[in-house]
Amino acid sequence: MPSIKLLVWCCLCVISPRLCHSEKLFHSRDRSDLQPSAIEQAELVKDMLSAQQFLAKYGWTQPVIWDPSSTNENEPLKDFSLMQEGVCNPRQEVAEPTKSPQFIDALKKFQKLNNLPVTGTLDDATINAMNKPRCGVPDNQMAKKETEKPTAAQSLENKTKDSENVTQQNPDPPKIRRKRFLDMLMYSNKYREEQEALQKSTGKVFTKKLLKWRMIGEGYSNQLSINEQRYVFRLAFRMWSEVMPLDFEEDNTSPLSQIDIKLGFGRGRHLGCSRAFDGSGQEFAHAWFLGDIHFDDDEHFTAPSSEHGISLLKVAAHEIGHVLGLSHIHRVGSIMQPNYIPQDSGFELDLSDRRAIQNLYGSCEGPFDTAFDWIYKEKNQYGELVVRYNTYFFRNSWYWMYENRSNRTRYGDPLAIANGWHGIPVQNIDAFVHVWTWTRDASYFFKGTQYWRYDSENDKAYAEDAQGKSYPRLISEGFPGIPSPINAAYFDRRRQYIYFFRDSQVFAFDINRNRVAPDFPKRILDFFPAVAANNHPKGNIDVAYYSYTYSSLFLFKGKEFWKVVSDKDRRQNPSLPYNGLFPRRAISQQWFDICNVHPSLLKI
């Protein structure tokens, strides 16, 4: 009797998956206890036939339909009952690749973009270029509007109609094997996810400002710990976030349908994907626009600190570029090159990568709390004392160092104010002033009704002044006659005045007499007249920034700035008004790539 009950239970498990505690489609199990399977080696290009297959596969012969839902004609047949004996047809002569104009033309295009001699012949240099490790995404893809194949929605609709017809003709539904049930479930899930992705996009880019990503549970690699894998992916997403107005957040709790980008590792036929990996040595990974990223676990991926193997960080950054909408860029230094170029862990996104992604998503914009040039003295290699400066931008609780020679922020910024500037308020600084003369050298941060003096040598705020008075101090005590809170401030070395901005007024504070200068305050509109009519911030300035790079003063308000007419400008054009304001411009047009990152990525 017990054996009969056991048999019935087993049958129910096969027929009804819900009765069984089966393994989830996506789970979080660490597979480090499993023995890795033998690594397969990718087939190399070595002759005309394999070269022809390579050119066709990557879109050089003609653009390729790159669609995760496309069927793979080479997929092994699962139902052998459908096999039929083939019909014998007369043998047809196949043209040799070397005589095909299409093959020669494709070969020439490949050679040209890979900086090879354009010969149209399959020489050793061309074969070597084809055998370089690369991304699995085709170099030339067919535009969606050019494809005539049914979409995933149409395919699923047709499958549904066929199923309805069968149900109507056969009242008793056929028994579905459990494997086929899972296949249909995964297909419908993928269709739903694709439809949601279409709703998120305009057809070209994500329209959401916050994208969520996740490593799918089945797709962890055996080669690195789970924490190492997640760290690398967080860093790769941060690299893109530093140069574009999108945030990325790892989300391991929301339903899978709400995840924008899913990442995973696999070998050969993997993760329900229609594109099989080829083994070690050639394709490292592939990705889909607004979709998933898969990594070939036959490859030897390593952490950024390793000098050996394949940098998972570099491959991940490349594939994320595809998901965001970038194609391959045939430019030395670009992360979007199709071929993997071994490089140290210090690589960063090239100018071409940054401009390409900003062409899709726009540049980073936003107001700032303060901006300033930090002046300091140090000895050079000859022991001589030299004066240098670094440029900083503050926003909320973050700061960026701006590298003026490269016209971009320092790689790895922003950083938390609390970590870089010790003893001052950790967010929403109102202004910074550096009083720098032959006899004085003092730096001040202002917030609310108080100010802090900063010790640049010890990199922290002073606890007290020379008279033993503690910091922070009231602005009204240290700068008599100046109201608080202030909007912005800067120091004019020529006149030795600190100019404080509050609402629609500007105050000139004489540092030698420790008082407000005569005839002040004045209206900002009068003290800084507009060069062009009706083009003036009028009041509530965010930042007053004197730049030593441009030898000019800039007034920031919101996302825009006004450059103050300099002495050099007046020498070139005497008709310009003294302290006049040139017409507004976007801050992002003068200072590039000052981008926020998601708080979860701030500590990387």
Curated annotation (Swiss-Prot):
Binds 1 zinc ion per subunit. Hemopexin repeats lie at residues 365-424, 426-482, 483-531, 538-594. It is found in: Secreted. The active site is at E319. The keyword DNA-binding does not apply. GO terms for biological process: collagen catabolic process; determination of heart left/right asymmetry; determination of left/right symmetry; extracellular matrix organization; proteolysis. Its cofactor is Zn(2+); Ca(2+). InterPro entries: Hemopexin-like_dom_sf (IPR036375), Hemopexin-like_repeat (IPR018487), M10A_MMP (IPR033739), MetalloPept_cat_dom_sf (IPR024079), Pept_M10_metallopeptidase (IPR001818), Pept_M10A (IPR021190), Peptidase_Metallo (IPR006026), Peptidoglycan-bd-like (IPR002477). Residues 23-180 form a propeptide. Keywords: Calcium, Cleavage on pair of basic residues, Disulfide bond, Glycoprotein, Hydrolase, Metal-binding, Metalloprotease, Protease, Repeat, Secreted, Signal, Zinc, Zymogen. GO terms for cellular component: extracellular matrix; extracellular region. One of its GO terms (molecular function) is zinc ion binding. Glycans are attached at N158, N165, N404, N407. Transmembrane segments: none annotated. It holds the Pfam family Peptidase_M10. Its EC number is 3.4.24.-. A motif (Cysteine switch) lies at residues 133-140. Residues 1-22 form the signal peptide. Residues 132-175 are annotated as: Disordered. Gene3D superfamilies: Collagenase (Catalytic Domain), Hemopexin-like domain. Its main location: secreted. Belongs to the peptidase M10A family. Plays a specialized role in the generation of left-right asymmetry during embryogenesis. May act as a negative regulator of the NOTCH-signaling pathway. The conserved cysteine present in the cysteine-switch motif binds the catalytic zinc ion, thus inhibiting the enzyme. The dissociation of the cysteine from the zinc ion upon the activation-peptide release activates the enzyme. This is Matrix metalloproteinase-21.
